[in-house]
């Protein structure tokens, strides 16, 4: 996937990977550190985060690997992370929005938002907005948003029941919020010249991570009939391969001209549906993201 000639492609470049202390994010960080990148990884817990950074330093020989503590569930937490990044590095070449959430029971964050919506949509919008000037100053730069092909399973209007108060099924809410992430990412890509900052989406594939281990047949009722097969595929696929796919989007010269694209598989660009490609839907997601970031913590929202 990453050619031998690309092994040193990231020397002198700085990458931030959210949720980089475990699972796919950790594996992505390992690959990019081996390619010579200065790597910043984030997580909620300091102990495991520092341990993860130390392990990557030992394995890669890259001393410029650092952990930053962050609460991605709140807008303020993402803003504080951006402050840490600005203080830690002079520029940012790649932002990998990898962290996400899937919760078996409904809960709300300190901002008053349903937690899946906060982690998978509001948080990435807030962080990307804060760090965009740093990316632009480092042009050509990249924003890689990790999503799930599960977004295709969400068929209702994506702008209804945002707080999931009418119905809460964890896998469905996850698909809903990932669809919103796809839409807002495409809206951002249209706003930025490709030679300045590219914005792409990647589905790294199913793999055996802490998130997938927490899933049950009740998580995604639409997959209940094939759940044993889904479980088998998850168990047989390691997060290492998924991390390589994300790292490919973050580093490979072979995708330097792409923006506003969704990647799957090897990974290769895949055509999205008319719904995802609809500029009106993308703009509605953009406005929604701006409203939720601005309104964080001011009141509880519904609908």
What are these regions (language model features)?
Residues 208-230:
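A glycine/serine/threonine-rich, flexible loop-to-helix segment
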Residues 159-168, 220-228, 266-270:
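Short glycine/proline- and charge-enriched loop/turn segments
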Residues 143, 199-201, 246, 260-263, ...:
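A recurrent short beta-strand within the Rossmann-like NAD(P)-dependent oxidoreductase core
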Residues 150, 270-272:
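Short active-site-adjacent structural elements
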Residues 108-109, 272-276:
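Short acidic, glycine/proline-rich loop/turn micro-motifs
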Residues 275-303:
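C-terminal amphipathic/interface module of NAD(P)-dependent oxidoreductases
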């Amino acid at each position: 996937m990453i050619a031998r000639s690309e092994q040193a492609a990231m020397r002198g470049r700085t990458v931030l990977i959210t949720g980089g202390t475990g699972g796919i994010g950790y594996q992505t960080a390992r690959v990019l550190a081996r390619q010579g990148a200065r790597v910043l990884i984030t997580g909620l817990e300091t102990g495991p985060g520092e341990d993860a950074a130390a392990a990557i330093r030992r394995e890669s020989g890259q001393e410029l690997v650092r952990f930053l503590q962050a609460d991605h569930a709140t807008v303020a937490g993402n803003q504080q992370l951006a402050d840490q990044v600005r203080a830690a590095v002079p520029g940012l070449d790649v932002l990998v929005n990898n962290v996400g959430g899937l919760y078996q029971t409904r809960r709300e964050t300190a901002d008053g938002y349903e937690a899946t919506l906060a982690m998978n949509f509001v948080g990435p919008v807030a962080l990307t907005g804060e760090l965009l000037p740093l990316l632009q100053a480092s042009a050509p730069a990249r924003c890689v948003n990790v999503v799930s092909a599960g977004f295709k399973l969400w068929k209702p209007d994506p702008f209804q029941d945002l707080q999931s108060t009418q119905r809460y099924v964890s896998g469905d809410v996850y698909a809903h919020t990932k669809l919103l992430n796809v839409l807002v990412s495409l809206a951002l890509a249209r706003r930025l010249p490709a030679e300045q900052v590219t914005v792409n989406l990647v589905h790294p594939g199913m793999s055996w991570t802490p998130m997938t281990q927490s899933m049950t047949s009740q998580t995604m009722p639409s997959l209940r009939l094939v759940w044993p097969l889904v479980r088998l595929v998850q168990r047989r696929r390691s997060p290492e391969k998924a991390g390589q796919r994300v790292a490919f989007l973050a580093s490979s010269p072979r995708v330097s001209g792409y923006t506003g694209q969704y990647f799957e598989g090897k990974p290769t660009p895949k055509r999205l549906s008319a719904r995802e490609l609809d500029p009106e839907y993308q703009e509605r997601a953009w406005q929604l993201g701006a409203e939720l970031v601005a309104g964080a913590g001011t009141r509880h929202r519904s609908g």
